[in-house]
Amino acid sequence: SIKSLSTGNDTIFTPTDSTDFSVPREVTVHANDGVSKRTYTVDIRVYKENPDSLAWTQVANNPLSDIASFVESKALSVGGALYVFGQRADGTTQVVQTETADAHFDSAINIAGLTHFNVRSVQYFKGQFYALANGQLITSATGLNDWTSVSTSQRFDALAAVVADSIYGVADGKMYASADGQTWRLSQIDTEGHLPTQNLAFTTLQSRTDKNGYMAIMVGSDADGMAVWKRDFDATGSFSYPWMYIPQTEELGEYACPKLSNVNLFTYDGSTILAGTTTEGTMVPFYTSQDNGRTWKANELPHPTLTGVKALAVTVDSEQYIWVICSGTGIVYKGRINRLAMGE
């Protein structure tokens, strides 16, 4: 039976009749013995926004903030916190740490005692931050001001990627991998001569066809424009694959990976998303790859309109918000596809 909205009395529920569930309704279920019963409240909630739309919210707009002064930057989401690493024009290295639930970007902490700290190299691996300072691998437990050198003789031109069990670095045109940051081994690549060391970004994503498979996509600048690499991984450890170079050939036309400044790469809604700017400091449309780095299509995902960008940092937090942090203006946006908030 169901409680009547007009009388407040129980009435027999008829499945073939229409029932008003615009407000919570009390439904009573009776057992076959005619004695036992249990009452439930049925509350049907309808999501009234377009599930596939993405709206951007401006979180900060302070041209006097520390992040506005960065000329190089990198953002990471770790747990419920955002870390924005930046370098100022005078070479000072800083980091802004803030909670995603109540984000503030006005003040930064100086990272002191290190020369040539490469903010674009910062990675998070197995509970530690890693970065390069003058080619030397350094690490920190907090990402703030406790950086120390890692005990390894290996020096690097770039830190390339992080997956579940390994961190990857590029040195002298070769790819290296480590499970602990100290012992490094060569990692196989299928093509020589195209490993990027500048303007480099990576992301990882789950395979659409193999529950035990995932992959890393890496992009960066090389002599020919933008280099794109992919490596497949098997979570069971049964198979091993090399890093594969994905040539951005002429026949790709407008779907080739664009040559951008301030490159960022992230995974969102099952696709690989490329963000960046023109050399004049205008944020370009997001480029989406649904074939793991082979082709790139613009404007599949809405993006904020930004100009005057000196450095751009983009990351995705645990709540599926995309954060876009613009140095030069101090503007910060966040946005999320509505249905991802619904837990799809």
Functional labels for PLM-detected ranges:
Residues 52-63, 103-114, 147-154, 185-193, ...:
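Beta-propeller fold detector
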Residues 1-71, 340-344:
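Beta-rich interaction/scaffold domains
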Residues 294-299, 306-344:
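Blade-level signature of beta-propeller repeat domains, shared across WD40, Kelch, NHL, RCC1
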Residues 59-91:
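Beta-strand-rich domains and repeat architectures in extracellular enzymes and scaffolds
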Residues 79-84, 127-131, 165-169, 211-218, ...:
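Entry beta-strands of beta-propeller and related beta-repeat scaffolds
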Residues 96-101, 139-141, 177-179, 230-232, ...:
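Conserved Ser/Thr-centered positions that define the repeating blades of beta-propeller domains
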Residues 253-290:
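Loop/turn-rich, solvent-exposed surfaces of beta-rich toroidal or solenoidal domains
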Residues 63-76, 110-127, 149-166, 191-211, ...:
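Repeated scaffold domains used in trafficking and secretory/extracellular systems
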